[in-house]
From Swiss-Prot:
An annotated Gene Ontology molecular function: structural constituent of ribosome
Stated name of the protein: Large ribosomal subunit protein bL20
Gene name as annotated: rplT
The keyword Ribosomal protein is annotated on this UniProt entry: yes
Cellular component, GO annotation: ribonucleoprotein complex; ribosome
The organism of origin for this protein: Wolbachia sp. subsp. Brugia malayi (strain TRS)
């Protein structure tokens, strides 16, 4: 049986971590043990924040829809309820896009919602 030395695999593993640590400050970019800690923490942050990003965007969309709805005398909750009554099936992302970039279309939508709410109450 031939003797197996692990220098090649160790070097490859260290190189992989140090490549991931490019751009870090101080010894975190050049010292394997410190780089390993920093890279592991960075990956934890990345995992967590991929989930938080979804929450943050939904929150941003709701804020934008609420601001646009209030310009037309409606609150966010009443606006969304009115959309459901009117049978409008648009998600928050599209509604926020309309509120920011297509104000005329959003105004028509708000008028539709207002008429449905008045008709229903």
């Amino acid at each position: 049986m031939a003797r197996v030395k692990r220098g090649v695999t160790t070097h490859a593993r260290h190189k992989k971590i140090l490549n991931l640590a490019k751009g870090y400050r101080g010894r975190a970019k050049s010292c394997y043990r410190i780089a390993l800690q920093r890279v592991e923490k960075a990956l934890q942050y990345a995992y967590r924040d991929r989930r938080n990003r979804k929450r943050d965007f939904r929150s941003l969309w709701i804020i934008r829809i609420n601001a646009a709805a209030r310009e037309h005398g409606l609150t966010y909750g009443r606006f969304m309820h009115g959309l459901a009554l009117a049978g409008v099936d648009l998600n928050r992302k599209i509604l926020a896009e309309m509120a920011v970039n297509y104000k005329d279309d959003f105004t028509k939508l708000a008028e539709t919602v207002s008429s449905k709410l008045a008709e229903n109450s």
